[in-house]
C-alpha cells in the first residue's frame, strides 16, 4: 500500500472530510507537546517515539465528567480504554470477532490525546468536537504512524472509523460497552463517595445501549445500584 489515508467518511458518518467546515483555527499540530515537535523537526525523526509521547497524554488526562463532579483523583482516559478493552474479551456472542473488538476499543478514544475529553456541557459543539477528532486521527495516522508503518496506520484509521461510524457488529458492541464501562465506573464512585455524588445524568446512557448482551449486563448493574441506594437510605433513616 502506498496511498495516503484519505478515507472520506467523517466521524459523523456522513460528512466527507473535504467538505467538513473548519469552524475554528484549532489544529492538532498546535496541541503537540514542544518536545515532540522538537523530535519531529530532526532530519531523521523517531516517529515511533513521537507517537508514543502523544499517546502518553491519554495516561495523564483525567476524565472531564468526573472532574466536573469534584472527583479530583478520577480515572484517566487510558484507564477507561484499558478496562473497556478487557470487557470486550468477555463477549459471549458467537457472531462477534472479539480480537477486532479489542483493537477498536484500544483506539476509539485515541484522538483525545490531543483533543482532550470534551463533554456535552463544554462550550464546544458536537460538530466541532467531531471535526477536531477527525483532524487528529488523520494527523496521528498520516504524520506520525505512516512514516514508520503504513499498514499499521491504515489499520488504526480503519478501526477508529469503524467505531465512529458503527460499520460493524464489533463496533456496535464497543459503542455499547463504552457506555457500560462508564456506568460501572459511575457506580464505583457512588459507592466510594457514599452516594454524595450525583451520577443520575450519566445513567441516561442506559437507553442508548442496543445489543442484548450488554443490555443484560446493564440491567443487572442498574438493579445493584437501586439496591445499594435503597440500603443506604434505610441505614441513614434508622
From Swiss-Prot:
The keyword Metal-binding applies. Its cofactor is Mn(2+); Co(2+); Mg(2+). Residues 77-183 form the HD domain. Its EC number is 3.1.3.89. Keywords: Cobalt, Hydrolase, Magnesium, Manganese, Metal-binding. One of its GO terms (biological process) is deoxyribonucleoside monophosphate catabolic process. It comes from the Eukaryota. A divalent metal cation 2 binds at residues 112, 117-118. PROSITE patterns: HD. Catalyzes the dephosphorylation of the nucleoside 5'-monophosphates deoxyadenosine monophosphate (dAMP), deoxycytidine monophosphate (dCMP), deoxyguanosine monophosphate (dGMP) and deoxythymidine monophosphate (dTMP). PANTHER family: 5'-DEOXYNUCLEOTIDASE HDDC2 (PTHR11845:SF13). Homodimer. Present with 2730 molecules/cell in log phase SD medium. This is 5'-deoxynucleotidase YBR242W. The lineage of its organism: Eukaryota, Fungi, Dikarya, Ascomycota, Saccharomycotina.
Amino acid at each position: 500500500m502506498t496511498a495516503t489515508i484519505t478515507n472520506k467518511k467523517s466521524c459523523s458518518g456522513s460528512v466527507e472530510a473535504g467538505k467538513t467546515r473548519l469552524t475554528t483555527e484549532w489544529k492538532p499540530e498546535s496541541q503537540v507537546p514542544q518536545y515532540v515537535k522538537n523530535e519531529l523537526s530532526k532530519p531523521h525523526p523517531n516517529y515511533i517515539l513521537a507517537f508514543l509521547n502523544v499517546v502518553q497524554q491519554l495516561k495523564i488526562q483525567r476524565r472531564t465528567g468526573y472532574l466536573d463532579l469534584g472527583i479530583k483523583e478520577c480515572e484517566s482516559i487510558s484507564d477507561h480504554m484499558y478496562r473497556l478493552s478487557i470487557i470486550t474479551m468477555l463477549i459471549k456472542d458467537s457472531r462477534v470477532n472479539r480480537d477486532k473488538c479489542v483493537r477498536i476499543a484500544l483506539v476509539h478514544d485515541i484522538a483525545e490525546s490531543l483533543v482532550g475529553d470534551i463533554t456535552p456541557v463544554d462550550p464546544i459543539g458536537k460538530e466541532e468536537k467531531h471535526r477536531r477528532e477527525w483532524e487528529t486521527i488523520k494527523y496521528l495516522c498520516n504524520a506520525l504512524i505512516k512514516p514508520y508503518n503504513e499498514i499499521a496506520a491504515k489499520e488504526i484509521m480503519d478501526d477508529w472509523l469503524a467505531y465512529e461510524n458503527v460499520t460493524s457488529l464489533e463496533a456496535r458492541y464497543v459503542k455499547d460497552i463504552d457506555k457500560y464501562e462508564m456506568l460501572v465506573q459511575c457506580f464505583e464512585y457512588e459507592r466510594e463517595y457514599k452516594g454524595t455524588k450525583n451520577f443520575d445524568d450519566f445513567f441516561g446512557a442506559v437507553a442508548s445501549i442496543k445489543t442484548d448482551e450488554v443490555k443484560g449486563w446493564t440491567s443487572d448493574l442498574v438493579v445493584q445500584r437501586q439496591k445499594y441506594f435503597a440500603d443506604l437510605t434505610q441505614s441513614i433513616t434508622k
